[in-house]
Amino acid sequence: MKHLTTCLMALLLPLSSQAQSQDAFPDRPIRLIVPVAAGGGVDTAFRTLAPYWAEQLGQPVVVENRPGAGQAIGIDAVAKSKPDGYTLAGVGVPIAFNTALGRKLPYDPVKDLTAVAEVVTQPLLVVAHPGVAAKNLRELIDAARSQTNPLPYTSGGPGSYGHLWFEMVASQYKFNRQHIGYNGVAPALRDVLGGQVPVLIDAIVPTGTQVKAGKVQGLAIVRSTRSPMLPDVPTLQEQGLNLPNAAPFYGVVGPAGLPPAVLNKLNDTLVRALRSPALQAKLTDMGFDVVASSPEAYGRKIRQEIDLWSKIVRDNQIKAD
C-alpha cells in the first residue's frame, strides 16, 4: 500500500505543479509578436494597447515586430511556440485572407492557433476624386451599371480588404470594374488625388483625412452607424445598399493548445484593458472601433471571414500575387 501511495503521489505531482504554474500566470513578461513593420495601423493599434493590457496582467507586454510574407512569418512563429501563453501575436486581416487567397502557409489559421480576442475593427471608406459626378456609393453603382466600360478603382493593394470588398459589391450589383493595383495605399491615394484613378476603397485612416480636407469626396462609410471622424459620410444602409458591414479586423492569437485557465486569463485581462475609457478614446481617435470579444466569437469570426472571402476570390478569379 505504501508503494502504491508513493506511485500515485509521483504521478500527481507534475499535474499539481502544472496547475500551480497556470494559477500564477503570468509570472514573467509576455511577448506580443506583431507581424508587420513598425509604424502601420496594425503596429500602432497593438502598441497603444500594450501598456493597458500589461497593467491588467501585472506583467510587461513586449511588442516585437516580425514582418514578412503577408504576416505569415510572425504568425508561424507563434503557431510553433510553446502553448504557455507567453508568446502571442497581434494580427490583422491576413489571419483569414492568406488562406482565402490560396497562399501556401506553414500553419493552419484554425487548427494551429488559438483565438484569444478580437480587439478592434477599422471601417472601410469609399472615396472618389472631386471630379466624379456621383456623390455617394449608390449613385456610383448606378452609373457603373449604366455603362459598358469598366469602372476603374483602386485599394490598398491586390488582395487587400478594400479590393475584395469592392469585388463583392460589383458581383452583387453586377457592374464591370477594373482594379488598379498599387503597392500600398499611399501611391493609390496619390493617384486618386491626382485624378488618374477615380475611386479608392481603403480603411478610414489615413484616407479619411483627405475627406476632411476636401481633397476627395466620401461616398460611403462601411459601418452600421456614421463615423464620429466623418459624420457627413453616409452608411451603406442609409443609401439602401444591402451589403454587409465588413471591416478590417485585428485580434490576438496564441498557439494551439493553450490551457483553458491561461486563455481565460488572457481574454479577461485583454477585455478589461479594452474597456478603459482612456484606451477607448485613443483608439477611437485613431479610427478604430473597439470590439473586445470572447475567444469563441473571435475564432468564429476568423472562420467566417475565410469562408466569405474564399468564395469571393474563387468567383471573381482574384489573384493577389
Question: Model-flagged regions — what are they?
Answer:
Residues T5-L15:
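Bacterial N-terminal signal peptides
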Residues A19-K111, P150-P152, P158, K174-A203, ...:
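N-terminal (or domain-start) structured segment
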Residues G41-A45, L49, G74, V93, ...:
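Stable alpha-helical elements in mature extracytoplasmic
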Residues W53, K80-Y86, A100-P187, L236, ...:
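Hinge/capping helix and adjacent helix->loop/strand transition within the periplasmic-binding protein
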Residues D108-E118, N176-I180, P198-V199, G208-A246, ...:
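Short beta-strand->loop
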